[in-house]
């Protein structure tokens, strides 16, 4: 039987929502092993004077729980 833990992470990029999601996953991979599924939960923009400054993507990510 397998157990999975779910966390939410947010990535940001000046280029696109896809780059923001990729950045979030790449950063999470540095400290979380065995990532399984990433679901896009929310996307938003940081604006200044009506211009896009930052794309932000919130992800719900699951990974296999190994216990302590």
Where are these regions (language model features)?
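Short, well-ordered alpha-helical segments
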Residues: 2-35
